[in-house]
Amino acid sequence: YYEYLPSLGINLPAYQGFDESTDPRISNGFATIAFRMGHSQITNLTVRLGPGYEVMDIAKNITMADGFWDPGRMLKEGGISPVLRGAAVTTQAANDIYYVHDLRNSMFGDPGFGGLDMCAIDIQRGRDHGVADYNSYRQALGLDPVTNWSEVSSDSEVVARLNQAYPDVSNADPILP
């Protein structure tokens, strides 16, 4: 709460105690879109470091594709401490439109045999759940709708990719922008 939420621009007030008037339910849109937000923050490597934060011979970094089907490997090769040290010094990836290679090409597939595309799954999940388009969510949050992608990003590559995928901003899936 003290590091991750502020990295998203969220600063929560101090806890004031239980409030029974708070509605604990979540919307379909939140469960379908917001809970997937972190997928673009996943990195391809699980970094493992020794006690002095050096690269270890016994416990090399593990790619997501290799470690997904063999999570016990982390314990067999050096234990959990190298993973925790690696996580402590690994910079959080940006929340953006980019999914790493292993999420785009190897998800749920046996190593060496391909797999599914997590980005495509996230987009299709939104469509299956009938969530509204990007501009509808902007308006529901009190934001003005956008008419072109340059209003969303100043990165010309991001704008070009979004234009290619969604020439009409009004038809954009809300998971991407």
Label each PLM-derived region with a short phrase.
Residues 1-177:
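Polyanionic, low-complexity segments and short acidic motifs
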